[in-house]
């Protein structure tokens, strides 16, 4: 079989599958709506999270550990601690605030007369350490313990409750997204499978005659796979339209909720690359469901034979 002939077979299968859908507009529309509803919720949640990055960014800020050197620590001691912290791969960022810088900031915020009454500079050198964003609360505690054991470090402070709360929020969002994506993806496959199965049953005699005439399984399966492809494309388009409508509907309500707190939602729709991924993923799910349905029917035919 030449490449041109093989290509023409696929083009003809795609055209016949599209015509088959257009012959039953009402049934096709119901199927598209059913498939679109199955994917609208995870897509809309993704849009909501991406649009709300300005708000979620405040929750995603990594917790920090403030390290206080001893007041008697020399510059060489601070340099040693800085070197040790820099070599620690668990840390994402290290900021040093020298005692002189701290005193200057204190002078700008307090009365000069009060500062002049101080006997020397009572402030220590300070390091503000930001661990890697993926650090768990248990790992944060380990980092905290290791830092307090460094030479000439007097103490360190960390908001352990905020670390735990932040981790739980991020884990909750991540698990909800995975759960919705998995369950609704499975629902989409099952709906596509059932839709193609009904199409196969409606053409059962035609398929069995074709099989008896010696047609290969790929020839029988091909039009149904393309039918699933067209259904996936159209249902994805309907779902994206629903997402756009939902976005415009909830936008004023959400803005009204966050406006008193000075929080602005950066609303957006899918980028071109994201649209390509959505269509590709949905087509893959639909074709997989159709493949399962056709394979099941062909196996049943072999068993009867």
UniProtKB/Swiss-Prot annotation:
Q: Where are the transmembrane segments?
A: 29-49, 176-196, 230-250, 269-289
Write out the similarity annotation. Belongs to the ABC-4 integral membrane protein family. FtsX subfamily.
Is Ribosomal protein set as a keyword in this record? no
Origin species, per record, is Neisseria gonorrhoeae
Query: What is the recorded membrane topology of this protein?
Result: Multi-pass membrane protein
User: Superkingdom of the source?
Assistant: Bacteria
Q: Name one GO cellular component term.
A: Gram-negative-bacterium-type cell wall
Q: What does this protein do?
A: Part of the ABC transporter FtsEX involved in cellular division.
Q: What is this protein called?
A: Cell division protein FtsX
Effect of gene knockout: Viable. Exhibits morphological abnormalities indicative of defective division sites. While division in wild-type cells occurs along sequential, alternating division planes, the mutant is characterized by the presence of multiple and atypically arranged division sites which frequently divide the cytoplasm into small cellular compartments. In wild-type cells, the replication and segregation of DNA precedes the ingrowth of a septum resulting in two equally sized daughter cells, the process of which is not seen in mutant cells.
Residues in a coiled coil are: none
UniProt keyword annotation of Metal-binding present: no
Location within or outside the cell: Cell inner membrane
């Amino acid at each position: 079989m030449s490449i041109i002939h093989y290509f023409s077979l696929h083009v003809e299968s795609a055209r016949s599958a599209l015509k088959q859908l257009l012959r039953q507009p009402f049934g096709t529309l119901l199927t598209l709506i059913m498939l679109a509803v199955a994917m609208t919720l995870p897509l809309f949640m993704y849009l909501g999270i991406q649009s709300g990055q300005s708000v979620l960014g405040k929750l995603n800020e990594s917790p920090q550990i403030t390290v206080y050197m001893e007041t008697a620590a020399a510059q060489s001691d601070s340099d040693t601690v800085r070197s040790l912290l820099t070599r620690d791969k668990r840390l994402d960022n290290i900021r040093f605030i020298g005692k002189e810088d701290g005193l200057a900031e204190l002078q700008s915020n307090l009365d000069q007369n009060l500062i002049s009454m101080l006997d020397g500079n009572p402030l220590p050198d300070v390091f503000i350490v930001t661990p890697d964003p993926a650090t768990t609360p248990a790992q944060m505690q380990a980092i905290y313990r290791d830092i307090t054991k460094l030479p000439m470090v007097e103490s360190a402070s960390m908001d352990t409750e905020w670390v735990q709360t932040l981790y739980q929020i991020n884990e909750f969002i991540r698990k909800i997204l995975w759960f919705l994506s998995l369950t609704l993806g499975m629902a989409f496959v099952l709906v596509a499978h059932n839709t193609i199965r009904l199409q196969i049953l409606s053409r059962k005699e035609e398929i069995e005659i074709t099989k008896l005439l010696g047609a290969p399984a790929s020839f029988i399966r091909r039009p149904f796979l393309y039918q699933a492809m067209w259904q996936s494309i159209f249902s994805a388009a309907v779902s994206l339209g629903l997402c756009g409508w939902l976005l415009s509907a909830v936008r004023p309500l959400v803005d009204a909720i966050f406006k008193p707190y000075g929080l602005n939602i950066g609303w957006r729709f899918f980028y071109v690359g994201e649209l390509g991924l959505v269509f590709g993923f949905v087509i893959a799910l639909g074709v997989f469901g159709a493949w399962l349905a056709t394979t099941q029917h062909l196996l049943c035919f072999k068993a009867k034979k």
